[in-house]
């Protein structure tokens, strides 16, 4: 298991854009799982929406991308590199994510060749699917 400090040693994201609290499982270059505890104090709830707070879907996808980045950047040969978001396909949102939810995040790397890779991301709350997407990333310096 990786805590927030250990995650920050692998990916460059910082508050308020670090969207993963813990990595619970990781297989270098193959898959990673983790979670974000969504609190009422998240900055994005100030405007999305003040009377009905819902986590923006793009931030759910970004959280998935960060988990996928951990799977790739934890590999010794990728340490110190960046994982850039290069595309999203077949993204679907099934349920809303609200304050108090524990957003469970899983990414399976389906393809990695050179500096380009793809992963299948799934986000759940209480075991129920809230988002799924195919993510494309590019590794850079």
From Swiss-Prot:
Keywords: Cytoplasm, Lipid A biosynthesis, Lipid biosynthesis, Lipid metabolism, Lyase. GO terms for molecular function: (3R)-hydroxyacyl-[acyl-carrier-protein] dehydratase activity. The active site is at residue 48. The keyword Cytoplasm applies. Its main location: cytoplasm. Its EC number is 4.2.1.59. Involved in unsaturated fatty acids biosynthesis. Catalyzes the dehydration of short chain beta-hydroxyacyl-ACPs and long chain saturated and unsaturated beta-hydroxyacyl-ACPs. This is 3-hydroxyacyl-[acyl-carrier-protein] dehydratase FabZ. It comes from Bacillus velezensis (strain DSM 23117 / BGSC 10A6 / LMG 26770 / FZB42) (Bacillus amyloliquefaciens subsp. plantarum).
